[in-house]
Regions:
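Active-site neighborhood of HAD-like aspartate-dependent phosphohydrolases
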Residues: 2-54
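Metal-dependent phosphoesterase signature
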Residues: 66-104
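Hydrophobic alpha-helical core bundles mediating ligand binding, dimerization, or RNAP-core interactions
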Residues: 32, 36, 40, 61, ...
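A short, Lys/Arg-enriched amphipathic alpha-helix followed by its capping loop at the start of a domain
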Residues: 39-43, 101-111
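Short helix-capping segments at alpha-helix termini
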Residues: 42-46, 72-75, 132-136, 165-166
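Asp-based, Mg2+/Mn2+-dependent phosphohydrolase catalytic module
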Residues: 2-15, 107, 111, 120-240
Length: 240
């Protein structure tokens, strides 16, 4: 693939690239879904990792827990979230990797970047540190814990844009989940759907497009050229 030049990147119709973390920057979703499913099953809510992926991908663990408690008719253990976090951290410490070609992709993007993730701050920090991505984004790392409503609401994306001083219409979001795409579009932003993580399944591309993704891709090496060659999506967003 021909690498896009810095000049082209800077001439794109965007002033900020907002990255989701899990499933976009780091290939973590397959790990998180498996651990989440195992812990829920152990606490009396039998569920597979694929079911966790389909139901809760892109949403916060807190929201997932409240939904499950409503179905169970009882509360999960008071320390369930802490158990889940600890179990995921143990797995991440030895197995988590950056999404393939992520480092070279970020090196080719000269535009400002930030992270907007449904994860808790400590989880985001651990994920990015483990994969040597933290310093590329810090301190511009934003969590759903900083806003009232998580994805699919637009709150987190609007918060990130405001913190970075960029109008929503000049932002491009990179997302792997339907809630993330939905939230980005509700915020008035263009969004590229990424379906190249190890957790992705047939049909994900169509689901991202149906949710409003401006374009889709499955190889991070494609992203710099996609940004450089992008037409002005603001008119498209304004008309939808």
């Amino acid at each position: 693939m021909r690498a896009a030049g810095r000049e082209k990147i800077l001439s794109a119709p965007f002033d900020l690239i907002i990255f989701d973390c899990d499933g976009v920057l780091v290939d973590s979703e397959v790990i998180s879904c498996r651990v989440h499913a195992e812990l829920l099953t152990a606490h009396g809510y039998p569920i597979s990792s694929d079911q966790v992926r389909r139901r809760f991908l892109g949403r916060s663990a807190w929201e997932a827990g409240r939904e499950i408690e409503a179905e169970l008719g009882r509360a999960l253990p008071s320390d369930f979230d802490a158990q889940l976090k600890a179990a995921i951290f143990r797995e991440f410490a030895t197995t988590l990797e950056a999404t393939p070609h992520m480092h070279e992709t970020l090196a080719a993007i000269a535009l400002p970047v930030c992270v907007a993730s449904s994860g808790a701050p400590e989880k985001i920090r651990a994920s990015l540190t483990r994969t040597r991505l933290h310093d590329r984004f810090a301190p511009h790392i934003f969590s759903a814990t900083q806003v009232r409503n998580g994805k699919p609401a637009p709150d987190l994306f609007l918060f990130a844009a405001a913190q970075m001083g960029v109008p929503p219409a000049r932002c491009l979001v990179i997302e792997d989940s339907v809630p993330g795409v939905t939230g980005a579009r509700a915020a008035g932003m263009a969004v590229f759907g990424f379906h190249g993580g190890s957790h992705c399944r047939p049909g994900d591309e169509a689901a991202l497009l149906a949710a409003g993704a401006t374009a889709n891709f499955d190889d991070m090496r494609e992203l710099p050229a996609m940004i450089a060659q992008a037409t002005d999506y603001t008119a498209d967003i304004a008309s939808t």
